């Protein structure tokens, strides 16, 4: 695959700070298992490179990154609530067995 450069990404994102923030957030999402939005993604690419490729290809923007973060946060909260509910049920079962 062609080499991606910061200049390629700066054609899409206005400044370097914003580019770094977008790329780091997206790379974290990719590292945590979110599927890449570019076709023919090279499996050997590290998450940071994949994030930069998505930005340069105009497949990702701040709104989409925020949407994915929100969905991941809601999923984590839901799992935490389910875990807590399961612990309460287990504690109740154990206290019934103690009686």
Curated annotation (Swiss-Prot):
<keyword id="KW-0240">DNA-directed RNA polymerase</keyword>
<keyword id="KW-0804">Transcription</keyword>
<dbReference type="InterPro" id="IPR003716">
    <property type="entry name" value="DNA-dir_RNA_pol_omega"/>
</dbReference>
<comment type="function">
    <text>Promotes RNA polymerase assembly. Latches the N- and C-terminal regions of the beta' subunit thereby facilitating its interaction with the beta and alpha subunits.</text>
</comment>
<dbReference type="GO" id="GO:0001000">
    <property type="term" value="F:bacterial-type RNA polymerase core enzyme binding"/>
</dbReference>
<dbReference type="InterPro" id="IPR006110">
    <property type="entry name" value="Pol_omega/Rpo6/RPB6"/>
</dbReference>
<dbReference type="Pfam" id="PF01192">
    <property type="entry name" value="RNA_pol_Rpb6"/>
</dbReference>
<keyword id="KW-0548">Nucleotidyltransferase</keyword>
<comment type="similarity">
    <text>Belongs to the RNA polymerase subunit omega family.</text>
</comment>
<dbReference type="GO" id="GO:0000345">
    <property type="term" value="C:cytosolic DNA-directed RNA polymerase complex"/>
</dbReference>
<dbReference type="GO" id="GO:0003899">
    <property type="term" value="F:DNA-directed RNA polymerase activity"/>
</dbReference>
<protein>
    <recommendedName>
        <fullName>DNA-directed RNA polymerase subunit omega</fullName>
        <ecNumber>2.7.7.6</ecNumber>
    </recommendedName>
</protein>
<dbReference type="InterPro" id="IPR036161">
    <property type="entry name" value="RPB6/omega-like_sf"/>
</dbReference>
<keyword id="KW-0808">Transferase</keyword>
<comment type="subunit">
    <text>The RNAP catalytic core consists of 2 alpha, 1 beta, 1 beta' and 1 omega subunit. When a sigma factor is associated with the core the holoenzyme is formed, which can initiate transcription.</text>
</comment>
<dbReference type="GO" id="GO:0003677">
    <property type="term" value="F:DNA binding"/>
</dbReference>
<dbReference type="GO" id="GO:0006352">
    <property type="term" value="P:DNA-templated transcription initiation"/>
</dbReference>
């Amino acid at each position: 695959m062609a080499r991606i450069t910061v200049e390629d990404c700066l054609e899409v994102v206005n400044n370097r700070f914003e580019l770094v923030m977008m790329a780091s957030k997206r790379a974290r999402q990719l590292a945590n298992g979110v599927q890449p939005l570019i076709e023919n993604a090279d499996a050997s690419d590290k998450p940071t490179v994949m994030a930069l490729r998505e930005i340069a290809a105009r497949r990702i923007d701040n709104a989409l990154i925020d949407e994915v973060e929100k969905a991941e946060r809601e999923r984590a909260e839901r799992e935490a609530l389910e875990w807590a509910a399961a612990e309460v049920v287990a504690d109740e079962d154990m206290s019934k067995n103690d009686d």
